[in-house]
């Protein structure tokens, strides 16, 4: 009997609950050709959109969604008036060049203020320092200048190295030519001694 009841029960899926399978079987038995719209409306979910908007987007809160009423950058206030804008810039440039020329003429005889102040301040600082601190400062300034001049030193070293290599190449070429000439003279000397020996042999015989 247990086997017969097990065969009569419908097969259930893992994710379905008991009520959904039995209700669907009963509904299909009662309404074999029920409307699809009714079945979809039972399964579908309706959202209360106004409630969602009121909950998640209240009118009195912006949640960081501020609206900025500024123009996009770069902003030119005279974009509409092209003719006026050109004449304004020309007038401004003419005034700026005139005032700049006057300022340059007035400043020609003057020494720069920042250099004079810098020299005075360094003298005052040195007088306040102890001899040990002055020596440390002098060494620091010397190391700093060496560090800043290191790029120049590297360039000079490269030039000297390339010059030495070029000079070495010239010396090697001169040695090779001198060695070649000495070889030629030795060969000619050996040839002459061989001919002398042959002449001596011919005379003696």
Curated annotation (Swiss-Prot):
Regions that span the bilayer: none
UniProt KW keywords: Carbohydrate metabolism, Glycogen metabolism, Phosphoprotein, Protein phosphatase inhibitor
Region (Required for binding PPP1CC): 12-17, 43-55
GO molecular function: protein phosphatase inhibitor activity
A single GO BP: glycogen metabolic process
Acidic residues composition-biased segments: 80-91, 121-130
Location of Phosphothreonine modifications: 73
Alphabetical list of Gene3D superfamilies matching this protein: 6.10.250.1050
Biased composition annotated in UniProt, kind: Polar residues: 17-26, 182-205
Record-linked InterPro entries: PPI-2 (IPR007062)
Region (Required for binding PPP1CC catalytic center, displacing metal ions and inhibition of PPP1CC catalytic activity): 147-150
Cross-referenced Pfam families: IPP-2
Chain residue ranges for the region called Disordered: 1-44, 64-92, 107-148, 171-205
Recorded superkingdom: Eukaryota
Keyword Transcription regulation in record: no
Annotated Basic and acidic residues bias: 30-44, 131-144
Modified residues (Phosphoserine): 87
Function recorded in the entry: Inhibitor of protein-phosphatase 1.
Similarity comment: family membership: Belongs to the protein phosphatase inhibitor 2 family.
Name of the molecule in the record: Putative protein phosphatase inhibitor 2-like protein 1
């Amino acid at each position: 009997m247990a086997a017969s009841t097990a065969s009569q029960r419908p097969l259930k899926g893992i994710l379905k609950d008991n009520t959904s399978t039995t209700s669907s079987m009963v509904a299909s038995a009662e309404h074999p050709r029920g409307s699809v719209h009714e079945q979809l409306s039972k399964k579908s979910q309706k959202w209360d959109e106004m409630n969602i908007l009121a909950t998640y987007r209240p009118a009195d809160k912006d949640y960081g969604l501020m609206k900025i009423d500024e123009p996009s950058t770069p902003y030119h206030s005279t974009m509409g008036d092209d003719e006026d804008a050109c004449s304004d810039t020309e007038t401004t440039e003419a005034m700026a060049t005139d005032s700049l020329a006057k300022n340059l003429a007035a400043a020609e005889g003057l020494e720069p203020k920042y250099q004079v102040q810098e020299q005075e301040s360094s003298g005052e600082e040195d007088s306040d320092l102890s001899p040990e601190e002055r020596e440390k400062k002098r060494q620091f300034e010397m190391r700093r200048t060496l560090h800043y001049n290191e790029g120049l030193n590297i360039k000079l070293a490269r030039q000297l190295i390339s010059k030495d290599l070029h000079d070495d190449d010239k010396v090697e070429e001169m040695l090779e030519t001198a060695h070649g000439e000495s070889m030629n003279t030795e060969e000619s000397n050996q040839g002459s001694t061989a001919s002398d020996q042959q002449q001596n042999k011919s005379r003696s015989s």
